[in-house]
Amino acid sequence: MSFMKKSLLLVLFLGVVSLSNCEEEKGENENEDHEEHHEEKRLLGDLLGQTSKLVNDLTDTVGSIV
């Protein structure tokens, strides 16, 4: 009976440690995903800014030609 208790405690302990490691990795992955999403939004904002600048330059050029 003592052997079974020790085995059960060992299995439970290893399960808790494994679960803890999974939670840490999940948190790290969520942080990486959040950083990537933030970077994508920043790049999209830069792209939109450059596009609007290009459109303004083109309209100024076309306006000066006409």
From Swiss-Prot:
It comes from the Eukaryota. Its main location: secreted. Residues 1-22 form the signal peptide. One of its GO terms (molecular function) is identical protein binding. GO terms for biological process: defense response to bacterium. InterPro entries: Frog_antimicrobial_propeptide (IPR004275). Expressed by the skin glands. It holds the Pfam family FSAP_sig_propep. One of its GO terms (cellular component) is extracellular region. It is found in: Secreted. Keywords: Amphibian defense peptide, Antibiotic, Antimicrobial, Cleavage on pair of basic residues, Secreted, Signal. Residues 23-40 form a propeptide. Possesses a potent antimicrobial activity against Gram-positive and Gram-negative bacteria. Probably acts by disturbing membrane functions with its amphipathic structure. This is Dermaseptin PD-3-7.
